[in-house]
């Protein structure tokens, strides 16, 4: 038992070391935010927080931004800028809740798809359609690439595996354009760990899309990548939420 505990500890330490990235450096800075605000002059604290704010915006870390805006709001309590940071704080809290809701909807959708796959009941199919509608409503709340990616994932999957006779479109956007825009989002955020893993999901969706329309030359482009990662896709992605 003792040897197993030590082995597990070493494995955990190894995995944590592999997770080191520029993003984790920013989060470490954020973890020391009290040191920044209590141990430094106000002007230095504000400058430091604004630098962290810029880095968090670059990495699209909305939840962490709420912490920065909370402290900037406090530091500007005697300034007219307090209202500005209060607005930013409220906006990012609401946006974070929208992202959280979208992630839960996506997880619930795929759980519901499992029920539909085995039962093929009209009620289960209707529930999936209602979840797509709710996801669409959430995605419309913000001009957010992240919400766009979540909705696209759900919508394309639904039209390929639940309503295969329907044209694969995202609102007024054709599927080909949808895939292209998603790829641009991924390329614009190369250090985003979620997008790094979701790229495999969209390669799988592209493979299924081209197979569905019997465009086999295009399907070949994605087969090797998906086939090589098939075990990971089947074993681990369902555990996450996709």
Roles of regions detected by a PLM:
Residues 42-43, 62, 82, 165-172, ...:
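TPR-repeat structural position
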């Amino acid at each position: 038992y003792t040897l197993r505990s030590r082995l597990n500890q070493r494995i955990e330490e190894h995995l944590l070391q592999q997770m080191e990235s520029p993003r984790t450096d920013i989060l470490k800075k954020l973890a020391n935010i009290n040191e920044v605000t209590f141990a430094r002059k106000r002007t230095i604290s504000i400058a430091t927080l604004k630098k962290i704010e810029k880095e968090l915006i670059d990495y699209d870390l909305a939840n962490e931004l709420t912490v920065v805006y909370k402290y900037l709001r406090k530091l500007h309590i005697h300034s007219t800028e307090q209202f500005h940071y209060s607005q930013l704080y409220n906006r990012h809290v609401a946006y974070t809740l929208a992202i959280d809701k979208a992630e839960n909807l996506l997880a619930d959708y795929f759980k519901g798809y499992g029920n539909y796959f085995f039962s093929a009941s009209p009620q289960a199919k209707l529930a999936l359609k209602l979840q797509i509608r709710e996801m669409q409503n959430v995605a419309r709340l913000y001009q957010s690439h992240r919400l766009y990616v979540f909705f696209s994932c759900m919508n394309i999957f639904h039209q390929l595996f639940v309503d295969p006779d329907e044209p694969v479109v995202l609102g007024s956007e054709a599927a080909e354009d949808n895939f292209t825009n998603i790829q641009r989002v991924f390329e614009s955020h190369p250090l985003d760990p979620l997008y790094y893993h979701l790229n495999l999901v969209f390669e799988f969706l592209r493979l299924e899309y081209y197979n569905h329309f019997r465009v086999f030359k295009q399907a070949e482009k994605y087969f090797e990548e998906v086939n090589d990662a098939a075990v990971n896709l089947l074993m681990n992605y369902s555990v996450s939420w996709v």
